[in-house]
């Protein structure tokens, strides 16, 4: 046929059998990729330290999605929450991956069958004898079936009625586990951080989909609407489908980047806003304050802070710190976290407690400034030593660690104090192993960042695709030069200007 690459899909324009075939093949490719990617990630994933080397630090992309739907065990004998297991069951990570690959193979065979046997009776309009599809009826069928699936997921899988439930955690990502969730039918169900809203919204949306599907199966569209929206044209289906996909992509890009109950920080890493707002830092200080109120010493209070909470309060886990085009996992950037060194508290020679001003998200370098409790600058690492008034040496700054590996250790040497002040700019201080993976020290983004960037980018492209195909189907007559109200049978070549009966060619 000699079609250019951007026109090749016209081969399935009036061929319902092969249109079905290529969509089944597309499903085979998607499912096959998902299963294969899962097996690859399982081959490289190290489950030994779920606290300091979780899946999102290792750059896992499909494992978090399986986990949030209730998969936690591996045939390798490990659990995502730590420890070993003896009976993971069929629905382990490997089991889900295998199911996707088997399904992909079956879809592959089905696609070949439908490509070969394309001329089926079901696709033939008995009145005209030509291939055609009853698109409004197909829309009703698909709406009904997707409604059933949506309702079933919310009513059975999420609630644990027939299924594992979903991943649920506390606001600070410390106690996450898979559990059943009761639907939230009140105003709290609209809070994006309330897991109960996932169940209730799927039940409600599924019910609406079932009713809407039955409506479209039993009621035919009015003729004017049918013609006005070009409901008989397959390109209308393409345009509206693209609209549904790009809208969904924009929504999930938002829920991923800003955080929600569907994107737990234990599986996808913290959000950039938790660093910007000092979210974990405030919780850490609150816990320390509670410990001091219970007559614990400063050292004991800081020692009770979980490593997991301290690790979230580290700028290297901020997804906005990694460049969009820096390939690799977070571990390939600043290294594999080995242990928390403890919380450094700086004091000047007069005993004032000093706080290092933290680096904002979009800075690569930032001046080292130490302020007191009132926000007044008391010390810094000067840019020009000749003009310095607040240098560590002049102010006599010392540092002492509380909690962590260096608990109780103090340093007065200016070089060491400045080293830890620089590191305190980045949040809590961790020992990082950069040798194992030959990490280059340049921050990487987490799967949260990749997912958001990918879905926002493709949503924008698909938005333009929706406009393009919507315009093509709505203004098809204008582009083709044929008047839609022309009753006469137009014979191509009969007129000098297509569809204009005043320009009929003379028969010689």
UniProtKB/Swiss-Prot annotation:
Keywords: Chlorophyll, Chloroplast, Chromophore, Membrane, Photosynthesis, Photosystem II, Plastid, Thylakoid, Transmembrane, Transmembrane helix
One CC-aspect GO term: chloroplast thylakoid membrane
Co-factor binding comment: Binds multiple chlorophylls. PSII binds additional chlorophylls, carotenoids and specific lipids.
Family annotation (InterPro entries): PS_antenna-like, PS_II_antenna-like_sf, PSII_PsbB
Origin superkingdom: Eukaryota
Membrane-spanning ranges: 21-36, 101-115, 140-156, 203-218, 237-252, 457-472
Record membrane topology: Multi-pass membrane protein
Protein's cellular compartments: Plastid, Chloroplast thylakoid membrane
Primary residence: plastid
Residues annotated as signal peptide: none
A single GO BP: photosynthetic electron transport in photosystem II
GO MF entry, a single one: chlorophyll binding
Family annotation (HAMAP family): PSII_PsbB_CP47
Family as reported in the entry's similarity comment: Belongs to the PsbB/PsbC family. PsbB subfamily.
Subunit organization: PSII is composed of 1 copy each of membrane proteins PsbA, PsbB, PsbC, PsbD, PsbE, PsbF, PsbH, PsbI, PsbJ, PsbK, PsbL, PsbM, PsbT, PsbX, PsbY, PsbZ, Psb30/Ycf12, at least 3 peripheral proteins of the oxygen-evolving complex and a large number of cofactors. It forms dimeric complexes.
Stored NCBIfam families: PS_II_CP47
The protein's role, per its UniProt record: One of the components of the core complex of photosystem II (PSII). It binds chlorophyll and helps catalyze the primary light-induced photochemical processes of PSII. PSII is a light-driven water:plastoquinone oxidoreductase, using light energy to abstract electrons from H(2)O, generating O(2) and a proton gradient subsequently used for ATP formation.
Stated name of the protein: Photosystem II CP47 reaction center protein
Organism expressing this protein natively: Illicium oligandrum (Star anise)
């Amino acid at each position: 046929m000699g079609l250019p690459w951007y026109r090749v899909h016209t081969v399935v324009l009036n061929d319902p059998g092969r249109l079905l075939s290529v969509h089944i093949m597309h499903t085979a490719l998607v499912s096959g990729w998902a299963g294969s990617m899962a097996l690859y990630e399982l081959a490289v994933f190290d489950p030994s330290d779920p606290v300091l080397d979780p899946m999102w630090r290792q750059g896992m992309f499909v494992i978090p999605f399986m986990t949030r739907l209730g998969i936690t065990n591996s045939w390798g004998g490990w659990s995502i929450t730590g420890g070993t297991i003896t009976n993971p069951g069929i629905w382990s990570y490997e089991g889900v991956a295998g199911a996707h690959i088997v399904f992909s193979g079956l879809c592959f065979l089905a696609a070949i069958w439908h490509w070969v046997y394309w001329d089926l009776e079901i696709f033939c309009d008995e009145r005209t004898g030509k291939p055609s599809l009853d698109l409004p009826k197909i829309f009703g069928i698909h709406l009904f079936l997707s409604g059933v699936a949506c309702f079933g997921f919310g009513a059975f899988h999420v609630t644990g009625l027939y299924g594992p439930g979903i991943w649920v955690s506390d606001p600070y990502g410390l106690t996450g586990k898979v559990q059943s969730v009761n639907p939230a039918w009140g105003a709290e169900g609209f809070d994006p951080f309330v897991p109960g809203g996932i169940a209730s919204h799927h039940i409600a949306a599924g019910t609406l989909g079932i009713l809407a599907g039955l409506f479209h199966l039993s009621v035919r569209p009015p003729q004017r609407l049918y013609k006005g929206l070009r409901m008989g044209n397959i390109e209308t289906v393409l345009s509206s489908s693209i609209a549904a996909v790009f809208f969904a992509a924009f929504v999930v890009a938002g829920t991923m980047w800003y955080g929600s109950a569907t994107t737990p920080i234990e599986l996808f890493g913290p959000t950039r806003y938790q660093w910007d707002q000092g979210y974990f830092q405030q919780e850490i200080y609150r816990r320390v304050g509670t410990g001091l109120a219970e007559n614990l010493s400063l050292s004991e209070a800081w020692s009770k802070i979980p490593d997991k909470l301290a690790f979230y309060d580290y700028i290297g886990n901020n997804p906005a710190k990694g460049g969009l085009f820096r390939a690799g996992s977070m571990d390939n950037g600043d290294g594999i976290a080995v242990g928390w060194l403890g919380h450094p508290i700086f004091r000047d020679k007069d005993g004032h407690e000093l706080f290092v001003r933290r680096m904002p998200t979009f800075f690569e370098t930032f001046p080292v400034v130490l302020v007191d409790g009132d926000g007044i600058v008391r010390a810094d690492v000067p840019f020009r030593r000749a003009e310095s008034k607040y240098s560590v040496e002049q102010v006599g700054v010392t540092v002492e660690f509380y909690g962590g590996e260096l608990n109780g250790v103090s340093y007065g040497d200016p070089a060491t104090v400045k080293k830890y002040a620089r590191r305190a700019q980045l949040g809590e201080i961790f020992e990082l192993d950069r040798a194992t993976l030959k990490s280059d020290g340049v921050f990487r983004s987490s799967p949260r960042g990749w997912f958001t960037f990918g879905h926002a980018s493709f949503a924008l492209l698909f938005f333009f695709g929706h406009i393009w195909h919507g315009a093509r189907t709505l203004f098809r007559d204008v582009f083709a030069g044929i008047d839609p109200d022309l009753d006469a049978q137009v014979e191509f070549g009969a007129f000098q200007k297509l569809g204009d009966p005043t320009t009929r060619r003379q028969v010689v």
